[in-house]
């Protein structure tokens, strides 16, 4: 029996949230449920699980310790780190995932790497990509994955037969300045409106609606780290109250030829 005080237990279990099901997805036929859960109330590493509704049997579908290796520490892209900070996400492992319309396949990221899995056969494999991956989303038909990498939105086949996929929208593709990004939510949307994504698949998987964000009007702030005065200050665009916000527009692209 644990002799920890309540404050110690509350901290160790991350406010009594570890070990409970979260990010729940019910299949369209109601036969299975996909969810995230760690192995115990003091385990911070989330795994992906599949529940068969009729039998009540649970199957672990994806284990980060197997996918990355038990000795590999998480190396999060800046976008994923910011998302977790906004959501007060203290757990590790798989903290988000996406499924197709029938919950037959899923995609997730670990340390900026893209993984796709089959929920029927329970296998997981990595898809090679260009740069770190953020916010991957499966197309409704389960054939394609759209994801953000840097300031661009890319699309890749789940079969991995199109080497690294293709860039669907990005400042390099359109010869735009480095204040422009595609596929990510702007600061105000993510921080104040609880909208953390910047692109959406069409129901027929043929098109993607993508946010274009231009931060050129946003004021630049310089933030220094008092603990490391030898390091230069970071330049950050921050839309303080009463100042200009980013310019945001929505565009629709054909996802595949």
Locate each region found by the language model.
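Beta-propeller folds
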Residues: 1-257
């Amino acid at each position: 029996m644990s002799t920890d005080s309540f404050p110690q237990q509350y901290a160790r279990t991350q406010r009594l949230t570890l070990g409970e099901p979260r990010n729940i997805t019910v299949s369209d036929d109601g036969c299975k449920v996909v969810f995230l859960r760690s192995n115990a109330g003091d385990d911070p590493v989330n795994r992906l699980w599949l529940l068969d509704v009729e039998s009540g049997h649970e199957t672990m579908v994806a284990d980060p310790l197997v996918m990355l290796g038990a000795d590999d520490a998480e190396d999060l892209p800046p976008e994923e780190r910011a998302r977790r900070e906004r959501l007060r996400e203290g757990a590790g492992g798989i903290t988000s995932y996406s499924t197709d319309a029938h919950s037959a396949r899923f995609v997730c990221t670990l340390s900026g790497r893209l993984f796709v899995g089959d929920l029927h056969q329970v296998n997981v494999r990595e898809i090679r990509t260009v740069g770190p991956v953020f916010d991957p989303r499966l197309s409704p038909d389960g054939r394609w994955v759209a994801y953000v990498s840097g300031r661009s939105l890319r699309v890749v086949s789940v079969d991995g037969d199109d080497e690294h996929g293709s860039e669907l929208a990005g400042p390099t593709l359109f010869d735009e300045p480095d204040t422009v990004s595609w596929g990510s939510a702007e600061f105000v949307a993510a921080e104040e409106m609880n909208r953390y994504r910047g692109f959406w698949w069409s129901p027929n998987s043929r098109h993607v609606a993508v946010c274009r964000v231009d931060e050129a009007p946003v004021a630049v702030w310089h933030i220094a780290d008092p603990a490391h005065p030898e390091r230069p200050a970071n330049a950050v665009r921050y839309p303080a109250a009463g100042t200009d916000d980013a310019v945001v527009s929505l565009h629709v692209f054909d996802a595949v030829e």
